[in-house]
Swiss-Prot record:
Role this protein plays: Blocks voltage-gated potassium channels Kv1.1/KCNA1 (IC(50)=145 nM), Kv1.2/KCNA2 (IC(50)=2.5 nM), and Kv1.3/KCNA3 (IC(50)=15). Also inhibits calcium-activated potassium channels (KCa/KCNN).
Tissue/organ expression: Expressed by the venom gland.
UniProt-recorded name of the protein: Potassium channel toxin alpha-KTx 9.5
Domain of life: Eukaryota
Locations listed in the record: Secreted
Stored SUPFAM superfamilies: Scorpion toxin-like (SSF57095)
Chain positions found as Valine amide: V28
One Gene Ontology term of the molecular function aspect: toxin activity
Record GO biological process: negative regulation of potassium ion transport
Disulfide pairings: C3-C19, C6-C24, C10-C26
Length: 28
């Protein structure tokens, strides 16, 4: 999942989307 899709990808997981080196991370 790219940075632009990260917020949508993490949505509903009570997570804070962050992006490191182009990699999406959903930090719960």
């Amino acid at each position: 999942v790219g940075c632009e899709e990260c917020p949508m990808h993490c949505k509903g997981k009570h997570a804070v989307p962050t992006c490191d080196d182009g990699v999406c991370n959903c930090n719960v």
